[in-house]
């Protein structure tokens, strides 16, 4: 029998390993379907496209909201500290938190994982976090893509991207034009740095020592605010909302109010956590 000179595996792409990962995802997904009983059909998992039944969401004048995002250079720290089981929570949070500030209830999520060389243990750990993030935000992971790309990424490097979809009634959409003079600004505490500003964080880390406890704070997962924001919107207690990401308080809050209004924030009322003091 003639030997094959060229193969995908020799070029750096392990299809057999990728198939094992797909089987793992399918197995975990089916368990999630049985637990939640809120999916189109557990037998359709593994198809070319992902299906989701929206008929159970009895929302008047429904509007679909979609968001996509990544985790940025926080990935470099996760790689450095060999901590992969919470970065998936970060990924879901970065997408879902953009949905809920418009009043949308998260419905489903899709992920994209790009790697230089597929490591089954590492990828399963990342996916564990993604499933956890979906659980925390009460949405379903219904699909995704894992791409092994030798030559684009070195063997231990990877990148993540997420895509989320939510639903909101047209009358319940939060936007800056709902804001009126004398409205009160409410702040919901963060869990730490979240997933922005890590190029600066890593630059500081190169020049300064950090304790083990604070090191753990650096990779603490981004908080998911679904329950808090959706509770407030259900009670009609908020007019607009802002997800504080790149640009910080100033840039993001200005996106949530009309041009003819200004904000007055008493920063002395905001408790500064240890990690921000270190920075």
PLM feature spans:
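Short helix/loop capping segments that flank catalytic or ligand/cofactor-binding pockets
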Residues: 60, 74-76, 195-198, 252-253
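A short small-residue
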Residues: 4-7, 72-78, 107-114, 206, ...
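N-terminal glycine-rich phosphate/pyrophosphate-binding loops that anchor nucleotide-derived ligands
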Residues: 2-100, 138-142, 150-151, 187
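Glycine-rich anion-binding loops of enzyme active sites
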Residues: 45-46, 51-55, 71-72, 82, ...
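Glycine-/charge-enriched secondary-structure boundary and capping motifs
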Residues: 2-12, 21, 27, 122-137, ...
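Structured alpha-helical segments in the cores of large, soluble enzyme domains
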Residues: 91-102, 229, 275-279
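Extracellular/periplasmic catalytic domains that process cell-envelope and extracellular macromolecules
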Residues: 57-59, 180, 228
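Short, compositionally biased
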Residues: 198-208
């Amino acid at each position: 029998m003639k030997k094959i000179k060229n193969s995908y595996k020799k070029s750096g792409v392990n299809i057999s390993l990728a198939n094992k990962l797909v089987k793992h995802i399918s197995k975990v997904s089916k368990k999630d379907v049985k637990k939640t009983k809120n999916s189109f059909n557990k037998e359709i998992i593994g198809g070319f496209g992902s299906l989701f039944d929206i008929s159970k969401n009895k929302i008047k004048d429904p509007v679909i909201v979609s968001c996509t995002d990544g985790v940025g250079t926080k990935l470099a720290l996760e790689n450095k500290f060999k901590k992969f089981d919470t970065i998936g929570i970060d990924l879901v949070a970065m997408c879902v938190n953009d949905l809920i500030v418009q009043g949308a209830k998260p419905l489903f999520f899709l992920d994209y994982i790009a790697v230089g060389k597929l490591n089954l243990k590492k990828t399963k750990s990342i996916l564990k976090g993604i499933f956890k993030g979906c659980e925390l935000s009460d949405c379903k992971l219904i699909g995704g893509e894992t791409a092994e790309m030798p030559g684009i990424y070195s063997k231990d490097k990877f990148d993540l991207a997420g895509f989320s979809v939510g639903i909101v009634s047209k009358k319940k959409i939060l936007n800056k034009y709902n804001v009126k003079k004398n409205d009160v600004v409410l702040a919901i505490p963060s869990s730490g740095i979240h997933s922005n500003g890590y190029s600066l964080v890593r630059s500081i880390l190169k020049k300064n020592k950090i304790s083990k406890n604070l090191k753990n704070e650096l990779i603490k997962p981004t908080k998911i605010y679904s329950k808090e924001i959706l509770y407030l919107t259900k009670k009609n207690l908020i007019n607009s909302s802002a997800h504080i990401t790149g640009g910080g308080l100033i840039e993001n809050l200005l996106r949530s109010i009309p041009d003819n209004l200004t904000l007055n924030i008493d920063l002395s009322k905001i408790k500064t956590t240890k990690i921000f003091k270190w920075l």
